[in-house]
């Protein structure tokens, strides 16, 4: 994976609202990292900047020392927090579109995951539940041979009983040397797959630490520390 670096990144929306304030992050190849925080903390804005959908108001973002741009997008597979797919399309047609658009898209991997999740490729998205639609979108993202997978709230719309299975699908279907960056507020469900966690609040980094260090130095789980920091 190409190392990712954010340096003193800030972003303000029209009207002057400061959503991200002087954020610096480093993610190395092969790491599974979560940006955690409550709703409105700045998680989605941060991942949109990393994916090149928003341009920082100030600061810089690099992949392997190259500025984020058209070239970096070839190496990033991004799951947004809202679906962007055509609800009238059948799953198999969407897979074909992705295969035509992305050189690194693996159709076999996509169909394997559909089978494991018992999703019929002939079904139209509009006939599916919200959770199943999100599973389809996740399958599309994880079927690329990318360097960085950015997942914005990947299990928020999934039934709690299915979350472990979804996480297993994620971990079983990404490139071994790639990194995964997950934006979430559901810490307990993903803690065991993480190497590092970044706490963000009101657009600022409150803490960056490895999961092992948090457990060793604080004597508690990441989820317990999250609840303490955010008093939830």
Q: Where are the regions a protein language model picked out?
A:
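Helix-to-loop junction immediately C-terminal to a conserved catalytic motif
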Residues: 51
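The feature captures the beta-strand-to-loop junction immediately N-terminal to the Walker
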Residues: 36-38
């Amino acid at each position: 994976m190409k190392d990712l670096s954010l340096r003193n990144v800030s972003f303000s929306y029209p009207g002057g609202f400061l959503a991200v304030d002087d954020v610096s992050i480093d993610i190395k190849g092969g790491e599974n990292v979560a940006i955690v925080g409550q709703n409105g903390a700045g998680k989605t804005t941060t991942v949109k900047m990393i994916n090149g959908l928003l341009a920082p108001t100030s600061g810089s973002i690099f992949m392997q020392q190259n500025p984020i741009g058209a070239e970096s997008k070839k190496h990033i597979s991004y799951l947004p927090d809202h679906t962007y797919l055509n609800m009238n399309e059948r799953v198999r047609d969407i897979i074909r579109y992705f295969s035509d658009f992305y050189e690194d898209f693996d159709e076999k991997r996509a169909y394997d995951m559909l089978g494991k999740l018992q999703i019929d490729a002939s079904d139209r998205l509009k006939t599916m539940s919200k959770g199943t639609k999100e599973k389809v979108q996740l399958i599309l993202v994880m079927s690329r041979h990318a360097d960085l997978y950015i997942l914005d709230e990947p299990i928020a719309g999934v039934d709690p009983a299915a979350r472990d299975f979804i996480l297993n699908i994620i971990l079983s279907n990404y490139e071994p040397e790639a990194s995964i960056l997950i934006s979430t507020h559901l810490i307990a469900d993903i803690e065991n797959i993480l190497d590092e966690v970044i706490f963000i609040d009101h657009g600022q980094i409150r803490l960056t630490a490895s999961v092992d260090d948090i457990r060793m130095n604080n004597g508690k789980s990441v989820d317990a520390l999250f609840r303490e920091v955010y008093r939830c």
